């Protein structure tokens, strides 16, 4: 078992890796330790009532981490873990990956190349009373949209000379993206942040 520290300038937690050599297929089991809650968020307390636990990161993804650990315990209990080749990777920066990726993802990439079979243990879903396993994950891409307009008095907006303005044009483009992709299976589009304009009413005095 190894704690892999990240450089201080990356401002990201390290990773916890556990490796066991054996024969047969090489398994990589992936989880992550971080969650989206800020340290000063009101939702910080871990509580356990019977077999129900609540707290930050329980479903994303302490539950999956627990599944990994107890699955390995079960395999050990029945005597089949002894000869298995397994690597468990608990990353510390899944929610916001450290940069550069050549450092933050180095060990995970190497483990992925080593493995014959890789399983991620993020929570799946329950639909219509049945449990579902996730057999694939979507990738993502990020874009920056920059729109410029002609500075003019608001009374001229929508005229041929002035146009709709940069903010209206940005909204039109974003809505066009939304109209194009909504309904496509597995495809989503989200405008994360938007900023525009300077002041509502400018007084030269």
Which residue stretches match the model-derived regions?
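Broad gene-expression machinery/nucleic-acid interaction feature
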Residues: 15, 85, 116, 140-144, ...
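Hydrophobic/aromatic beta-strand patches that form the interior of the parallel beta-sheet core
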Residues: 2, 27-29, 89, 117-119, ...
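Acidic-enriched catalytic cores of C-N bond-cleaving enzymes acting on peptides and small amides
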Residues: 135, 155-205
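Acidic/histidine-rich catalytic neighborhood of metal-dependent amide-processing enzymes
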Residues: 61-136, 196-201
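Alpha-helical metal-binding/catalytic segments enriched in His/Glu/Asp
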Residues: 29, 48-99, 141-147, 156-180
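Acidic/His- and Gly-rich active-site-bordering loop/insert found
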Residues: 1-56, 76-83
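Fold-independent oxyanion-binding glycine-rich loops
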Residues: 4-6, 31-33, 91-93, 121-124, ...
């Amino acid at each position: 078992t190894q704690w892999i520290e990240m450089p201080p300038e990356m401002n990201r937690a390290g990773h916890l890796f556990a490796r066991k050599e054996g024969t047969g297929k090489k398994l990589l089991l992936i989880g992550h330790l971080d969650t989206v809650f800020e340290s000063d968020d009101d939702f910080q307390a871990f509580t356990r009532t019977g077999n129900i636990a609540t707290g930050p990161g329980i479903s994303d993804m302490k539950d999956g981490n627990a599944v990994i650990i107890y699955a390995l315990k079960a395999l050990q209990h029945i005597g089949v873990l002894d000869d298995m080749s397994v690597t468990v990777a608990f990353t510390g920066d899944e929610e916001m990956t450290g940069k550069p990726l050549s450092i933050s993802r180095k060990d995970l990439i190497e483990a992925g190349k080593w493995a014959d079979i890789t399983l991620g243990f993020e929570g799946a879903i329950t639909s219509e009373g049945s449990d579902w396993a996730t057999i694939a994950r979507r990738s993502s891409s990020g874009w920056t949209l920059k729109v410029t307009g002609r500075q003019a008095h608001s009374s001229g907006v929508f005229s041929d000379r002035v146009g709709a303005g940069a903010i209206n044009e940005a909204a039109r483009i974003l809505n066009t993206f939304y109209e194009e992709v909504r309904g496509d299976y597995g495809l989503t589009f989200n405008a994360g942040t938007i900023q525009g304009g300077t002041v509502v009413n400018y007084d030269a005095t």
